[in-house]
Amino acid sequence: MAEPITIRPMLAADAGPVLAIYQAGLDAGDASFETQAPSWTAFDTAKLPAHRLAAVADDTGDLLGWVAVSPVSSRCVYAGVVEHSVYVDAAARGRGVGAALLQALIESTEAAGVWTIESGIFPENTASLRLHERAGFRVVGIRERLGSQHGRWRDVVLLERRSTVAGLS
């Protein structure tokens, strides 16, 4: 059963928990090629402010997860295309937090005219692949041996969600 949560804009005051959840995801090994969470300044600079959202437990106020986007390119033709990251605290997984974050992200990006949300996910991260499929993402390809992590070449599944309301004209 999903616990009562609130999805709200990410705040600078969330930096500690956001980066801790990020680092825990990186430490688990199937979230990213990165091994170290960035500084808050680097995170804040890279992510679009209008689409940085946090999931907070209604009863405790604890930050349970977050989602944020970055532009995929500075070229104007890609103005409506973003790449997202979604991370959920290990203790909150399986409770609907990731689904709520993705739904809120879809709503915020569509309201801003974003027509495509992309993500690259390791094929071993089956929970994330299922989460994205349920949120309307589809696999558009597999980037084979995209990069090396800890001496092992890894594939990345490229997913996208095309808006049904933004970018249609």
Residue ranges and their predicted role:
Residues 68-71, 76, 118-121, 133, ...:
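Conserved catalytic-core motifs of GNAT/GCN5-like acyltransferases
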Residues 109-121:
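Conserved GNAT acetyl-CoA-binding A-motif
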Residues 84, 117-119, 159:
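A structural signal for short, well-ordered beta-strand segments
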Residues 5-18:
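A short beta-loop-alpha structural element at the N-terminal edge
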Residues 93, 119-129:
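Conserved beta-strand-loop-alpha-helix junction that forms the acyl-donor binding cleft
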Residues 28, 32-91, 102-103, 108, ...:
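Acetyl-CoA-dependent GNAT
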Residues 94-107, 130-134:
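Conserved acetyl-CoA-binding loop-helix of GNAT-fold acetyltransferases
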Residues 80, 145-169:
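C-terminal "cap" of GNAT-fold acetyltransferases
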